[in-house]
Amino acid sequence: MYRSGLLTSGGGSAALTALRAIGSRSSLSNGKFIWNVGKRFITSEIQEKDQQAGESNTATDTGIIHKTEQETLVYFDNVYPRDTSLWNPAQWYNLLLVNQSREAVRDKITEFASPPSNPIHGLELRSTIPVKRDGGVFATFLVPSKYTKAEVNAIIQKNTAEESSKSIFSFFTRASAFPVKGFPWIEDLRRLPTNTIKVLFQGPPLTEEEIYSLFRRYGTIIDIVPASDSVKNASVRYKSLKGAICAKNCVSGIEIHNTVLHIQYQQEARNFVISNFFVNHTRIAIPVMLAVLSIIAVLIFDPIREFSIEQKITHIYSLSWDNYWIRQIRNFTNSTVTSFRNYWGVNENAFAEKHLWEERIEKVNDLKMWLQENNNTFVVVRGPRGSGKNELIMQHTVGDRTNVLYLDCDKLIKSRTDAKFLRNAASQLGYFPIFPWINSVTSVIDLMVQGLTGQKSGLSETKEAQFRTMLTTALTSIRRIALKGYKSVIVDGGEDVNVKEEDYLQQHPEAKPIIVIDRYEGKSEINGFIYKELADWASMLVQMNVAHVIFLTETVSSNQQLSESLPNQVFKTLVLSDASKENSRKYVLSQLQSFVDSKQKSKEDIKITENIEAEKSKITDQIDDALEPLGGRMLDLQAFVRRVKSGEQPTEALDKMIEQASEQITQIFLSDKVDGIKSAQAWELIELLSAKSVVSYDDIVFKPLFKAAPELGIVELENSGLITVSRNRGVLDKIRPAKPLYKAAFYYLVNSQELSTILRTRYLLKVITFETGRIKKWEDELRPLGKSGDPKLFRGRFEYLSGKIETSNKVIVASEAEIKALSERKQNQK
């Protein structure tokens, strides 16, 4: 048997001679073992080949340590950090903080072996061979002539123990030195040290007593398993790694009683409890693992998300105008400027109120009073599209509040994918971090787990569940904001008074955040679940009395959804309608007057302001004429004012707004991309509403285009924003344009010869297509009836279908005739 490492005497030919030598047998003298070394462990041919090739024969390259008879080999332990595992952090710690260069290690070994306090005169350190995996170093010393090897080894052991114990970190850094008795094999295999060594016998095995006597000096032995007939090797288990490492490096290769001992670390059979549990009990293990991962995710991410939502509401750490400190600076500077303006006779509050008409100012005051009453504030602000609901709430009612959360349902509804929906919801709530892509991954994992275990893992969540989780986290953050200034005990007149959270919230309405939910409709074909979730969430906020909730909606139908979530709650309802002509006139004139008063007479503004002043009476008359078709819709009035401020005449501004509205209607409702029936229905209503301001539902219900599903068609156009419908006890009643400006736009589309010809032709073609489809359906029904044996049996049905076909055919003929007439008229105009 050959061994792949060896301690040899001398170098070159002397080493080869030692390798070829046959060691003498060990003998017992006076009860003591006499260990004579000389057994061949590695073939000498390898060194001969290396020498012939001129290759290195160092211990690092060959695993063999060379020394002469005048040298002694000592193993120093705990010089480097031991590799107890592949990811031992101690090795990185020592690598960064301890000097481990070759020179530093040699100085350290010399200091241990021959310190100034007890030097060995003439001792020379010849070489050091590090074994970093084991944390030690082999050192060869030249023995001085006046010492024997035994004396030098004993002094080195003593000095090392004393010197390494002087450090304040000696508990961790204490080193040991042991003479090397065997032939160490210097290898860097990935055999990590353990506290158990395996002793392989090349020859008759040693007894348990012999093994103990040989290995005990290196450390406390816990157990010895001697060799048996079936197992030819023994194992020695030490209390610590140190004993096993020193024994392996100092004894390996020794020969006793013609038996050579080869020592290796015994890798303990690891009991992979967790992996076995997963392999053998997948149905239990996978849900448990997922539950643990979920708990860890909650513990890590939920506090971050709650903080992020608080930041979204309070803006404490954001560099924006909503930041608390920036608001304080703005308030200070604004108050200073306001003081100067008031001194010069300019009333800022009066100027701000000019942005609202009288009824709106009263409604703002009512809203502010409701927020201060603190009696389960649940407000529903209802008004048609463009009535200024958002501006009324966000600017004039809660504009000075620092704890407002604004949610826009329309952005959530229009999210086409689950990932986009979750990102939009998280953005509005301030919910961060969020990982939408995980949902796709977990869905795949869920399918795999279901295939393996036969049951779903429950890892994947629907967007409804994830949205509900976001709202729950937001509720926790909102409650924390509301109770930020709460103290359970206050001092009143020298006495401690206990205060409940409910009492604190009741007494401090200003501490509660305001939640504004805009464009709440109650139902939708896509992502309609958000209305139910938001209503339930808002009801919890109000019932817990931790927030004020304001819903902005256009229709009455949303009240039904809110009533289901809060069945015992009386809503405070605020209805916004179009302004009267008088209020619209006052609003527009006040805006233009304030514009003139506030303008600085710069070179760019002189012309505009002078024109307005010079033609004030003329402009006033034009404004009166423009307000008739413009109506009292807030957004339209603001757009009109902006145009006039930019230098347009009122009539010019009105004409451009009508053209813009007409273009919008054409693109949304009358283009070729729109469904044919819907487009034809829209044109019929446009023609009717261009002549009358109000059309009764009874006038529509029996028209061919609406007869199949009249209510569905009307409601769809209402939801699209073309018309608005009033209801009488839940039944459709009166139909009006969605806003007053649309009345003028309808009239413009119908009476513009060029546009009306094109749009009317499109309408007639869609009517022809519609009627042709109906005729085809009836003909398909007639065909099998005509093949029946007795025509008299289905005469009634024949006559009915024939009459329907005749009526539709007349409509087609009339439509084609009208198209021909329109075409001829257009040719004549050219």
UniProtKB/Swiss-Prot annotation:
Segments in the Mitochondrial matrix topological domain: 42-283
Tree of life domain: Eukaryota
Record topology, Mitochondrial intermembrane segments: 305-830
CDD domains in the record: RRM_Yme2p_like
Transmembrane regions: 284-304
Keywords: Membrane, Mitochondrion, Mitochondrion inner membrane, mRNA processing, RNA-binding, Transit peptide, Transmembrane, Transmembrane helix
An annotated GO cellular component: mitochondrial inner membrane
Transit peptide: 1-41
GO terms classed as biological process: mitochondrial genome maintenance; mRNA processing
Cystines in this chain: none
Molecular functions per Gene Ontology: RNA binding
Subcellular location: Mitochondrion inner membrane
Domain RRM per the UniProt entry, residue ranges: 197-268
Family of this protein: Belongs to the YME2 family.
Entry function: Plays a role in maintaining the mitochondrial genome and in controlling the mtDNA escape. Involved in the regulation of mtDNA nucleotide structure and number. May have a dispensable role in early maturation of pre-rRNA.
The protein's name in its UniProt record: Mitochondrial escape protein 2
Species this chain originates from: Vanderwaltozyma polyspora (strain ATCC 22028 / DSM 70294 / BCRC 21397 / CBS 2163 / NBRC 10782 / NRRL Y-8283 / UCD 57-17) (Kluyveromyces polysporus)
Gene (name only): YME2
